[in-house]
Amino acid sequence: MKDNPIINDIAEKIAEKCSPEKIILISYKTNNYSELTSFKLALIVSDDVESMPELECSLYMDIDSDIPFDLVFYTVSEWNSLKDSEGTFAWKIKNTGAVLYG
């Protein structure tokens, strides 16, 4: 699913808007016809982001998609402290996700 044009288009738009360090595809769902129905992305962003809620809101408002998607945010320092801790969601993302950007 890493090569899905809809997912890649959203990842590209996110990269243009906020220049994250990394975008990782966490998961996706398809219907009985193997058509994409939703997906979830992790964004690893700079520690300098002033307001994570504002960034999240602006991305959801500015990026239009016919397919529902969710975003999970980590600052670089949060990501670095959690990605190697087995059992954390960051560890799971690192080990099972697909890097789309960065």
Annotate each language-model stretch with its function:
Residues 1-22, 30-36, 46-102:
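Catalytic core of pol beta-like nucleotidyltransferases
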Residues 27:
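A short acidic/basic microdomain associated with nuclease active sites
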Residues 39:
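Short glycine-rich, basic-tinged beta-strand/loop micro-motifs
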